[in-house]
UniProtKB/Swiss-Prot annotation:
Similarity field: Belongs to the isocitrate and isopropylmalate dehydrogenases family.
Enzyme class: oxidoreductase
Annotated binding of substrate, by residue: 137, 147, 175, 265
Subcellular location: Plastid, Chloroplast stroma
Variant or mutagenesis effect after changing residue 134 to F: Enhanced activity toward 3-(2'-methylthio)-ethylmalate, but reduced catalytic efficiency with 3-isopropylmalate
Subunit structure: Homodimer.
Protein name per its UniProtKB record: 3-isopropylmalate dehydrogenase 3, chloroplastic
GO cellular component, as recorded: chloroplast; chloroplast stroma; cytosol; plastid; thylakoid
GO MF annotation, one: 3-isopropylmalate dehydrogenase activity
Organism, as annotated: Arabidopsis thaliana
Gene3D superfamilies noted in UniProt: Isopropylmalate Dehydrogenase
Pathway, per record: Amino-acid biosynthesis; L-leucine biosynthesis; L-leucine from 3-methyl-2-oxobutanoate: step 3/4
Residues marked Essential for redox regulation (site): 229, 387
Site entry (Confers substrate specificity), positions: 134
Length: 404
């Protein structure tokens, strides 16, 4: 039988900007240290950014699962929770406080819940929660966003597509994250010579930005089924012409990867017509943003999809791709599985702890096999559960995987 391990919890209050705000939910940055009675092999610093809406709920559940899987693999985590997004706006007036950015950059990995909400929709652009996300991605220099879209056999009936179309879908979308139209200059709103308001943005990519995301995509495809589809709009956009030129040039370095190209409008159609044709997709920032959300509905729910944002060095940022869902916040209705699977990606891609990651992935499948479903993936014959209970079931499944 597996040995029983005791867990000792020690709460550390770290002095900081928020330590005097005792009446707020972010009373102070804190670390929860879980020390096993048996020797610990490795220790990691993890920054938690609960954010807004359902973010705190799903982060709480995912943290417990991450903690359990790590503990069973001899890992120790120091968790530091920091304000971010709308919560930070309410607390200190900016979506990304300097202390939050510093904590993130000094950690081994960051796990984010969700940001945004109706409350801040009318704020000036620089005071919206979403700007915090764009800025932290830049601060961390995470340029590669990996978004898996897999239709699990247990959830094939939840897909919006016919069963025969959705069954067996397993793709990875590699999205460039820090360039393109979201960051390009010039941008703005001005008045033209006719006195009419004009809004404009710039889609711009340098060769090195394309090369580095293409290499990530080729390496990803090489570890999967060896097929890479580059999505662009090279029949219209100059930035896409350069994109296709650079990706094609790099293909000679990866003779074992089959490269194809597709225009983004066709790719959007093919994703719902025949999604199984795709293995790995690489595309720019705005196209990736749109296509990955489209792919999420193939899987049955946006609440199932994790993501990893990685750079050449430094900590990665891991988050579910769903939003903050303020309409169900605080009601225990959120699906925590995307955040739990983001924690698995944190272990795998951020820390290189593949065994612990596999424990979490297997536990999610196990909980689904037992019929547990949150409302977004529920179908008759299964057991409807809330966010907390789904997390508890995954925890039980992780615990059952302890080696004997």
């Amino acid at each position: 039988m597996a040995a029983f391990l005791q867990t000792n919890i020690r709460l550390e209050i770290i002095p900081g900007r928020y330590s005097s705000l005792t009446d707020h939910k972010f009373r102070a940055p804190y670390r929860i240290r879980c020390a096993a009675a048996s020797p610990v092999k490795k220790r990691y610093n993890i920054t938690l950014l609960p954010g807004d809406g359902i973010g705190p709920e799903v982060i709480s559940v995912a943290k417990n699962v991450l903690q359990k899987a790590g503990f069973l693999q001899g890992l120790e985590f120091d968790f530091q929770e920091m304000p971010f997004g709308g919560a930070a706006l309410d607390l200190v007036g900016v979506p990304l406080p300097e202390e939050t950015s510093t904590a993130a950059k000094q950690s081994d990995a960051i796990l984010l819940g969700a940001i945004g909400g109706y409350k801040w929709d009318k704020n000036e652009k620089h005071l919206r929660p979403e700007m915090g996300l764009l800025n932290i991605r830049r601060d961390l220099n995470v340029f590669a966003n990996l978004r898996p879209a897999t239709v699990l056999p247990q959830l094939v009936d939840a897909s919006t597509l016919k069963k025969e179309v959705a069954q067996g879908v397993d793709m990875m979308i590699v999205r460039e994250l820090t360039g393109g139209i979201y960051f390009g200059e010039p941008r703005g709103i001005t008045i033209n010579e006719n006195g009419e308001e004009v809004g404009f943005n710039t889609e711009i990519y340098a060769a090195h930005e394309i090369d580095r995301i293409a290499r990530v995509a080729f390496e990803t495809a090489r570890k999967r089924r060896g097929k890479l589809c580059s999505v662009d709009k090279a029949n219209v956009l100059d930035a896409s012409i350069l994109w296709r030129k650079r990706v094609t040039a790099l293909a000679s370095e990866y003779p074992d990867v089959e490269l194809s190209h597709m225009y983004v409008d066709n790719a959007a159609m093919q994703l719902v017509r025949d999604p199984k044709q795709f293995d790995t997709i690489v595309t720019n920032n705005i196209f990736g943003d749109i296509l990955s959300d489209e792919a999420s509905m193939i899987t049955g729910s946006i609440g199932m999809l994790p993501s990893a944002s990685l750079g050449e060095s430094g900590p990665g940022l891991f988050e579910p791709i769903h939003g903050s869902a303020p309409d169900i916040a605080g009601q225990d209705k959120a699906n925590p599985l995307a955040t739990i699977l983001s924690a698995a990606m944190l272990l795998k891609y951020g820390l290189g702890e593949e065994k612990a990651a596999k424990m979490i992935e297997d536990a999610v499948v196990d909980a689904l096999n037992k019929g547990f479903r949150t409302g977004d993936i529920y179908s008759p014959g299964n057991k409807l559960v809330g966010c907390k209970e789904m997390g508890e079931e995954v925890l039980k499944s992780v615990d059952s995987k302890v080696p004997v």
